[in-house]
Structures are given as structure tokens and as C-alpha cells.
């Protein structure tokens, strides 16, 4: 049986739509899924980056040790592309062992690997805490900036929460950042930290220890 050309075209078009409708839709990450980023046993998933004068990153006693360098020092998580980019929390414990600048520079993606920011703890002489950068302003200049006291060789539990509309952070039980970011430009501070995208730990002229690093997916806020 022969069909008119117009009818044949409609049949083909309808079939195409039916096939398209049958394509699987990517499922959203299940809330509460926990991913261990550093287990204290290996640095295989991390890669040290030397931007010139950087300290070594080593595994010692179950800790990630970022040794003091003359510049930014740290390591990048090699499997970041497989992680959720939004609606997640990262938790860790960190301590400053020597030095007078930031002992936590947690660079993280916000939506995709091209849009990242850095949670800074102890910057600009040892106390500034905030996120670099928002609308081009770094952690010492924007609304997230605050002064927190950090003692050497004391462990600090840190939590970062990332959603499409908000960035939040806690040091211990104290919430130090609660910043709405809808419509704002998110980026890292121009300079050496750009070599540590999209997920990393860094320090500046400081030795630090990191442990118990986990990422947990969270439900999309309503």
C-alpha cells in the first residue's frame, strides 16, 4: 500500500517523537548518598599541583598533610567530574600546624566544573573566613567575610553546603556563611588557585592536616 507523501512525513515525524519520548531521563542524585573523598588510607584519588614553590602533599598517619610552601600548595581531586555539582555538602576536619595564613582553601564546583569558588578559612593573616569570589570580590571583600580565631594544632570540623541559590558554611557548630547567590557571578580568585579546579584543598604559606573528607548529596531546596 502506498501512502501520500504528506502522510508518510507525518508517520515518520510521529515515530521520531515516540522514540525521543522513550529516551531515559537522567535521574537526580539520591539525597543522603555519601561519598568518601579521602579515607586516610591513600592519596590515589588526589594529585598534587605545584604552581612554583608549592609544598609537598603527603599521607601520614591517616592524614592528608599539605606542607608549607612559598606559595599556594595543595592537591586536586581527580574524580571530580563524576561527582554531583550542585545540592551537596562537603564535610571535613582540618588543623593548621604552622604558618600564618589560610589552612583550608576548599575549591568546589557550583553547578558545573567551569563555575567554581573557594571556601577560605584563616586567610589574610590567619583569621579571615569567607568565599572567593562573588561578583568579582574575594573572601576579604564580599558579604561572606568574617574574622574567626583559629588556634594552631586544633582540629576544626568544617561543613560546606552548595545549592543553586545559596552557599553556606559552618566551622564547628557556628554558621559563618549564609550567602544567597542567585543572579551573582561565582568564580575563583584570579591567580594560582585557578590551577586547582574544580575540587581541591589548598593552603597559603601554611602547613595543614586534613582528615575525614566526605561529600553528601542533599535534596533540592524547595
Language-model features: where?
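Carbohydrate-interacting regions of secretory-pathway proteins
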Residues: 21-222
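Positively charged n-region of N-terminal signal peptides that target proteins for export
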Residues: 1-4
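Bacterial N-terminal signal peptides
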Residues: 6-15
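Juxtamembrane cytosolic interface motif at the C-terminal end of transmembrane helices
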Residues: 17-19
Amino acid at each position: 500500500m502506498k501512502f501520500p507523501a504528506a502522510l508518510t512525513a507525518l508517520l515518520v515525524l510521529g515515530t521520531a517523537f515516540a522514540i525521543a519520548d522513550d529516551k531515559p531521563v537522567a535521574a537526580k542524585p539520591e539525597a543522603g548518598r555519601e561519598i568518601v573523598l579521602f579515607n586516610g588510607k591513600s592519596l590515589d584519588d588526589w594529585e598534587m599541583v605545584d604552581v612554583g614553590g608549592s609544598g609537598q602533599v603527603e599521607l601520614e598517619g591517616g592524614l592528608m598533610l599539605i606542607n608549607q610552601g612559598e606559595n599556594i600548595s595543595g592537591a586536586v581531586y581527580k574524580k571530580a567530574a563524576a561527582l554531583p555539582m550542585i545540592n551537596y555538602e562537603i564535610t571535613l576536619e582540618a588543623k593548621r600546624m604552622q604558618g600564618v595564613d589560610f589552612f583550608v582553601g576548599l575549591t568546589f564546583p557550583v553547578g558545573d566544573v567551569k563555575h567554581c569558588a573557594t571556601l577560605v578559612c584563616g586567610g589574610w593573616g590567619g583569621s579571615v573566613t569567607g568565599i572567593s569570589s562573588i561578583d568579582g570580590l574575594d573572601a576579604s571583600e564580599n558579604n561572606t567575610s568574617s574574622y574567626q580565631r583559629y588556634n594552631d594544632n586544633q582540629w576544626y570540623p568544617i561543613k560546606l553546603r552548595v545549592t543553586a541559590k545559596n552557599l553556606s558554611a559552618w566551622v564547628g557548630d557556628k554558621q559563618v556563611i549564609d550567602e544567597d547567590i542567585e543572579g551573582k557571578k561565582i568564580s575563583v580568585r584570579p591567580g594560582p588557585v585557578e590551577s586547582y579546579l574544580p575540587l581541591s584543598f589548598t593552603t597559603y604559606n601554611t602547613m595543614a592536616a586534613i582528615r575525614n573528607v566526605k561529600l553528601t548529596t542533599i535534596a533540592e531546596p524547595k
